[in-house]
Amino acid sequence: MPSSIDLSGIAILDHHCHTLLQPGAPLIGDGFRRFFAETTDPHMAAHIRHTVFYMRMLRDVAALFGCAPSEEALLELRAATPPEVYARRLFDAGNFRALLVDTGFRGPDSYDTHELSQLVGRPVETIIRLETLMEQLIAASVTFGQVEDALRAELRIARARGVVGLKSIAAYRGGLHVQPRSFEQAAAAFPALKETARRYGRVRLADRAVLDYLLRVALEEAAAAELPVQFHVAFGDDDADLRSANPLQLRALLVDEAFRRVPFVLLHCYPYVREAGYLAALYAHVFIDVSLAVPLTAHGCTAAFTEALELAPISKLLFATDAHSVPELFYAGALHGRRGLAQILDRLVDDDILNAAQAEDAAEAILWRNAAGLYQIAG
């Protein structure tokens, strides 16, 4: 059912997303579809085109460009249109104010943040992925003490370098239950990680003694610098165990007095949106979004916003797409997200829970104002 509230004129501050791939060989079939689902199972490619989200995305992008609403027609259009023209059209139509980019999800064939800003014509700010930074420091250090010292030093100058926030993917490295660890426990596990880095030139930080210790170090520095820390929560790529990614697993960190000054930003949250909303209602330093559910759940976007707002204050809900690699994801996130938010705000007005002015103010807050204040983004 169409909404009577039009949010298209409110520019979005996308507080969690990733960069785009640089132009290469034209994408076809499975190579294109893989960006529109979280699965890495190659046998799922044939099924992605039958998801409600993918079918809706094709129709929406086709309507914008005036082509037939089919995968074949869209891929032909992509191949025939200069990449910069194609991307700018989607970002303009999506009406984005600025992008906060997690730079830890980037390959050699991706744009850097400056290049991305030039391409899309919007400010692009940096979010540091903590695990990526930790892995680099492990590879570059001789002792574990050097890793800790280097991590603290990097985070103390992060804001001066233009970094606006931090991000953890602990959910992908064993779960969100971050336990207290001693320096001695972490140092004892360091040699094995260092040997892996020496042998292969890189290391994947999954040892929880080291990760848990360094995450607490990072949170201490975030508290001092007043840097928001994003946590991947709930669903995502298929290498995360959804059972250990419930946001309630973070409670020990949230109630720790040492971290009460750290803004915790819980990303995605689906299907634990109510649990995340509960935490945002309890703790002043907890914020949430429903990115990835917006847009992947398609018609479920309204339900995601509805569940988030059952308990969470409007001032605690942020907007993000979690889009990456291809510009269609950004456009779909903006379009479907605005529709879903407008529909729940419509309902709240119709049910005499909010008045029209309150609903419009809520939309402004969720789509950009809350994030601008939290991350200290001007304008």
Where are these regions (language model features)?
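Divalent metal-binding pocket/active-site signature
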Residues: 161-274
